[in-house]
Amino acid sequence: MTLRPGQMTLADLRHIYQHPVKITLDESAYAPIQQSVDCVQKILAEKRTAYGINTGFGLLASTRIATEDLENLQRSIVLSHAAGVGEPNDDAIVRLIMVLKINSLARGFSGIRLEVIQALITLVNAQVYPHIPLKGSVGASGDLAPLAHMSLLLLGEGKARYQGEWLDARAALAKAGLQPLTLAAKEGLALLNGTQVSTAYALRGLFEAEDLYAAASVFGSLTVEAALGSRSPFDARIHAVRGQRGQIDAARTYRHLLGERSEVSESHRNCDKVQDPYSLRCQPQVMGACLTQMRQAAEVLAIESNAVSDNPLVFADQGDVLSGGNFHAEPVAMAADNLALALAEIGSLAERRISLLMDKHMSQLPPFLVENGGVNSGFMIAQVTAAALTSENKGLAFPSSVDSIPTSANQEDHVSMAPRAGKRLWEMAENVRGILAVEWLAACQGLDLRKGLKTSDALEPARLLLRKHVAYYEKDRFFAPDIEAASQLIALRHMNELMPAHLLPSL
């Protein structure tokens, strides 16, 4: 993959998250990188004072640093700021963080040498991933602690994972053919300052939300069939007169999945039903709103993934070094909060569809989707599990961006909490996956109870896939393994293949 700074797409970023990559930096980046370094060197030669180059940091910004201490200053900031806690991030997230940092630094506004950027690229290509703890950033003044842990490896400090094994830093560098670096003026701060960890966390949340949106669309369509629901609410004319783009596209997705008719729909063409419950009928409205939130969040995250969020910034053409606040991850935090709303609603609507299938008066199916009820409890407690997960997500959906706590002796007196905003999306996604696993099981059970009638051509593959791994419930059995099997299948992203093209931002 050739990296052209500032031009990465969401599809590129999804690929980097999901797969090891080999990166080459486009040569067009070399000149701007060198010009920014030359600008820093000129400031030092002229003995001008510039924050982050020859001063302390944060509340210590007014402290001038002697020339002979500048290299030690950069090493010290990395060592002192590597104060994260918690479990290490997995390789996929670390790889994404590193590529986002490379993409930002290579735009040529950070005053960092090509040698340092190439070292990060070499580590990514060799699949040597530094130990970056999950916790320790508030998403303002950048993701200082986690990015310091990333940068430790370049200095020969800390540890890294290579092929699943933890190695001390020098041994890990050797696997990539590297030696420890000595950072020059400005370089330590350039490595530490930025929103790359916050953005990586939120991107993972986006990718998982997209995958779950696809699965929920498929399983919601299966539930329409299992509950003998109508196709009329998905008619394009209904959605066109409202004009909401997400709703229009969601309805198109349901039409694509359900088709004009199926054996199931033909079996109840002439019935006395007038309207379906909202959890079936209003899927385009609810899922369309979720799709809109996801698209808006994706736009913000795509911009941030290509942004320069360092401080100070080096504008070599004018010879200026300017202090600002691009490290403040408020856009990322708000985008993640919107994704949380979408995830919560995707799960909530799915849980209501499960409940509908359980209720014999609503679905006209045996109570709890099992024959010989009383002796058998069927899906009774599986629905309770889905309800528990749904309720848990309501609490997790509380916005993180409205939380702030002052740090650094009140110099950094407002923060975004973007890492928390992004990281909780992973837990929410896991909960939604569990809810959707139950719906998939329930919808397929309901369809099997419809005398083996086939659903649409687009939906039959989803039904058959589940039945390859989970059998029909003739009577009660140990339920948890079936939920886990369905959940694992969802995690493989098969449902993405059933979506119309260009529906979801990164697919």
Swiss-Prot record:
The keyword Cytoplasm applies. The keyword Lyase applies. One of its GO terms (cellular component) is cytoplasm. Keywords: Cytoplasm, Histidine metabolism, Lyase. Pfam families: Lyase_aromatic. PROSITE patterns: PAL_HISTIDASE (PS00488). It is found in: Cytoplasm. The modification 2,3-didehydroalanine (Ser) is found at residue 141. Its EC number is 4.3.1.3. GO terms for molecular function: histidine ammonia-lyase activity. Pathway: Amino-acid degradation; L-histidine degradation into L-glutamate; N-formimidoyl-L-glutamate from L-histidine: step 1/3. Contains an active site 4-methylidene-imidazol-5-one (MIO), which is formed autocatalytically by cyclization and dehydration of residues Ala-Ser-Gly. There is a cross-link at residues 140-142 (5-imidazolinone (Ala-Gly)). Its main location: cytoplasm. One of its GO terms (biological process) is L-histidine catabolic process to glutamate and formate. It catalyses: L-histidine = trans-urocanate + NH4(+). Belongs to the PAL/histidase family. HAMAP family: His_ammonia_lyase (MF_00229). PANTHER family: HISTIDINE AMMONIA-LYASE. This is Histidine ammonia-lyase. It comes from Yersinia enterocolitica serotype O:8 / biotype 1B (strain NCTC 13174 / 8081). The gene is hutH.
